[in-house]
Amino acid sequence: MNERSTPQALTGPVIRAESLGKTYSEGKLLTQVFDGLDLQVMRGETVAIVGASGAGKSTLLHLLGGLDVPTAGEVYVAGQRMSALSDGDRGRLRNKTLGFIYQFHHLLPEFTALENVMMPVLLSGQSVCSAKMRAQMLLEAVELGHRLNHKPSELSGGERQRAAVARALANSPDCVLGDEPTGNLDNRTASTVFELMLELNRAQRTSLVLVTHDRGLARCLDRVLELYQGGLRELTSAEV
């Protein structure tokens, strides 16, 4: 795993899960995904979540991001208990505090790269001018300054994913949640996008929580947690 230490100047968890439980029901059949799961992600920390297919990695990420609700336990984001917030307040907290990157970029096809990255800033209530300046700066940071006015269909797979990284950072979030963000890319492009995320983590002190099946990428992060039998266990360097 990465030998750089977790930043000491930034204290306190940006995300905390306490005794988290999640059960799905299908007719009379109950499927328990988590039971009593605990997790803390500190500010500026990078965390990989690994585990077998079907273990619930994506479900956990959705719970941490307030996109789904737990059956038991609580999730706190920036110190706020998600279950105590209205849908509107939860959405505003997500937009301000969290960024999301998925395996597929989810860029809106009818808008340019610049417009896609501007949207979270506009939704936060900032002016068009501010949103444009922020989006342009981020797209230049991910080496897409020459592709601002291109729509997703005019970008390569790697370029689309880099635009998605820029969009995730649009509101300077405390934490970015990534669900296999490089899983749909070839090895070379995946490595480029991953290194970009780490560079932005170092520059902006944004925490990263990445679900990945790639143990090589996981080793580059501060901690590697394995989702196993409904809970999380931290892996040693030898186990990764």
UniProtKB/Swiss-Prot annotation:
Its main location: membrane. One of its GO terms (molecular function) is transmembrane transporter activity. Residues 15-240 form the ABC transporter domain. It is a peripheral membrane protein. One of its GO terms (cellular component) is plasma membrane. It is found in: Cell inner membrane. Keywords: ATP-binding, Cell inner membrane, Cell membrane, Membrane, Nucleotide-binding, Translocase, Transport. Belongs to the ABC transporter superfamily. Lipoprotein translocase (TC 3.A.1.125) family. The complex is composed of two ATP-binding proteins (LolD) and two transmembrane proteins (LolC and LolE). This is Lipoprotein-releasing system ATP-binding protein LolD. It comes from Xylella fastidiosa (strain Temecula1 / ATCC 700964). The lineage of its organism: Bacteria, Pseudomonadati, Pseudomonadota, Gammaproteobacteria, Lysobacterales.
